[in-house]
Amino acid sequence: VPEPATTELSPVRLQELLLEHPALDGFLAALACDLAGHLAEWDVSGASITVVRPRRQTVHAGSGPGVSASGQSAADPASGVLTTGLPVVVRHLGGRMRQTAAPGAVPGADAAAFASVPVPVPLAGAGAGGAVLTVYSEHPGAFGPEAVQAVERAAAEAAAAVALALRLDALTHRAENLQAALESRTVVDLAAGIIMAQNNCSQQSAVDILRSVSNSRNVKVRDIAAGVVAVVSDRVSTHFEE
């Protein structure tokens, strides 16, 4: 991951990041690095972004290896931001607190201060989680009111790009699920056809046979179907036009 440098957070730059990093975690890591550079004048030495979504794994990415390890526990400042919707700022992070904190609670091993702010990204559904930008400094006393306001402005500027990245990730996830479902359906249909030919029965009767065997063996219908097809074919492929 490149070292943070003073970076202009322009719409064009955000579009470039989306095109260069199609995977959500890669985009968030690159964005965190740019945000750290964009906010360098406010004593920011690193940044991380945490995204919490319903029924999906929490995504956490940082501007460097030390930052990427943070955000993995309930003690992470992002948890407080998501709960209250308000910034969480610690200007003097003592050495004892760093030693006793849960793993991932401190955004960066050398952090002396940090600030976490919400990223205004609308996520559908009740209790849908949210996104949080956390920045940290190696200098105690960082992140006064003006600095926190600058971090909040940066989070607002990045919100549209984060929302688009989340939408693209959701569409990709849905497409992968649909493809898996279609592939599973192909195997079941082929197995049903084989059973129909062998037993001279209807399609529904063939499917019922597969389900009956599935229930008796406590094995998924798709796996039973794959076994039937394997008797007459070594490989089953499903073709998609994209």
Predicted features, each with a name:
Residues A112-G125:
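A short, aliphatic-rich beta-strand micro-motif
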Residues R167-E242:
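Signal-transducing coiled-coil/dimerization helices and immediately adjacent hinge/linker segments
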